[in-house]
């Protein structure tokens, strides 16, 4: 028996080392507010695969699904309360957590600018205080919103039209006399098909992911605001990570964000694809277009400051040009 003692001691030591190594790896649960077939989500799944490939022994991410796992407008609350660790969403989908989430649509400075001008730190201060969240990275930007319609208009007037919205568009569309209704993205196709809505607000891209081009006749130009889709994390979970895990996750999130110039060329290709699918452009004249975009901005900031008197003006300093 004495002869085997060193072997047993060695085996015990190796087992202990293995246990310590396993303890240093953590698996985080991520849910998407967007349907799994959307291009946003496919890009994020590629990012998750990269995180997991390089993060063995440090950090892994488990994608638990899209709105079928947690409904679109409940993802923010799920992140806030720790039901999930990371959410992939846009701020308009979690204004039920904090009104400031929707202000990010007004960004004229880039995510890179905001990391330099204090914007990223301010966002994280607000998100931590009001949402128990860490704002990891913005991974969609440089992307305008548009109005898509099945009925032609010749001026910025939506009188008599039923338009699907999220908080992104509510006040702006109402200022043009639209009848507005809020639905999750997954419900829009059926609403168009049944004539429940006459149009919707949406970015320049991602119609084809959801087959909305089949039920869409017109896109109104110019675009307005700036689509924002981000990775948000439960703050308690973020703080519980080791320094090495936090550094790794932050580094990978920043690398994902650094790819955002991709959206500039992608949006051009999507506009061309829409034209090829038969979606016609309704273009206002130069003077009307200028007033239209300025009105969207004016209404956006007025409502942002009304909703958040404390942080609205501070965000304006770092988001607006």
Regions found by a protein language model. Give the residues of each.
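Bacterial N-terminal signal peptides that target proteins for export
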Residues: 1-10
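Hinge/lid segment of periplasmic solute-binding proteins
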Residues: 118-132
């Amino acid at each position: 028996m004495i002869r085997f003692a060193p072997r047993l001691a060695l085996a015990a030591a190796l087992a202990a080392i293995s246990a310590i190594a396993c303890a240093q790896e953590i698996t985080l649960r991520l849910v998407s507010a967007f349907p799994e077939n959307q291009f946003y989500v496919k890009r994020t799944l590629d990012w998750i695969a990269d995180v997991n490939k390089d993060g063995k022994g440090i950090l892994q991410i488990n994608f638990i699904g899209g709105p079928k796992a947690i409904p679109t407008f409940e993802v923010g609350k799920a992140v806030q309360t720790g039901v999930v660790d990371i959410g992939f969403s846009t701020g308009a989908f979690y204004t039920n957590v904090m009104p400031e989430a929707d202000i990010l649509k007004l960004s004229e400075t880039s995510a890179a600018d905001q990391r330099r001008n204090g914007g990223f730190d301010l966002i994280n201060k607000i998100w931590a205080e009001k949402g128990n969240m860490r704002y990891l990275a913005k991974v969609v930007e440089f992307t305008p919103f548009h109005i898509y319609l099945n009925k032609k208009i010749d001026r910025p007037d939506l009188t008599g039209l039923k338009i699907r919205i999220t908080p992104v568009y509510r006040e702006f569309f109402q200022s043009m006399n639209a009848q507005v209704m809020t639905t999750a993205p997954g419900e829009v196709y059926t609403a168009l098909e049944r004539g429940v809505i006459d149009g919707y607000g949406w970015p320049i891209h991602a119609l084809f992911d959801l087959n909305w081009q089949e039920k869409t006749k017109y896109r109104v130009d110019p675009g307005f605001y700036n689509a924002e889709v981000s990775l948000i994390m439960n703050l308690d979970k973020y703080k519980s990570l080791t320094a090495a895990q936090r550094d790794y996750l932050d580094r990978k999130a920043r690398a994902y964000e650094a790819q955002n110039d991709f959206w500039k060329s992608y949006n051009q290709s999507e506009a061309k694809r829409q034209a090829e699918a038969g979606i016609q452009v309704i273009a206002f004249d130069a003077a009307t277009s200028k007033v239209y975009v300025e009105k969207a901005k004016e209404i956006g900031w007025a409502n942002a400051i009304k909703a958040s008197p404390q942080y609205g003006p501070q965000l304006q300093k770092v988001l607006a040009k």
